Amino acid sequence: MTTAILRRTAAQLFMVGLPGPTLEPATRRFLVDHPPGGVILFKRNVRSGAQLRRLIGEIHATGAGVSPLVAIDHEGGRVHRLPRPFTHFPPAAVLGAHRDVGLAEAVGRAMGRELRAVGSISPSRPCSTSARTPAIA
C-alpha cells in the first residue's frame, strides 16, 4: 500500500469541524486532499437554512467518490444550531423524563426530517452510560 493511499484511508477515520459558515479555498483543499469520513458542524457554521444547505452541498462535492458523513451538533435544549423557522426541540433529559418511547421517536423523526431538508444526515447526540443519569440534560 502506498503512503498516499494509506493517508487517504486513515483520513476517512476522522470527523472534522470547519472554521466558519463558508467553505474557504484552504478548507476546500484540505477536504479534497485529506477526505475525512465525516464533517461535524457547529453554531459557527450556521447562518440560515439556505446557507447551511449550500455549505453541506459544497462539503459533499469535495468527496472523491465518497461523500463524508455530515453531522451537526444539534441535540435539543441549549444545543440548538438551526435558526428559525426550524423547531427548537427539548433536551433529551426532558424527553427521557416522560418515559414515552413513542414521543422520543416522534421527536427524533421530526428532527431528522428538518436536518435532511438541509442535507445533514445526523444530529450529534450525547449518550448516557450511567444508570444514575438515564438522560442527558
Regions found by a protein language model. Give the residues of each.
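Boundary/entry segment of secreted carbohydrate-active catalytic domains
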Residues: 1-22
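A generic local structural motif
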Residues: 2-3, 25-27, 57
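Flexible, charged surface loops at secondary-structure boundaries
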Residues: 7-9, 32-35
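Short secondary-structure boundary/capping elements
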Residues: 18-23, 103, 107
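Enzymes and membrane/adaptor proteins characterized by extended Gly/Ser/Thr/Asp/Glu-rich
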Residues: 33-137
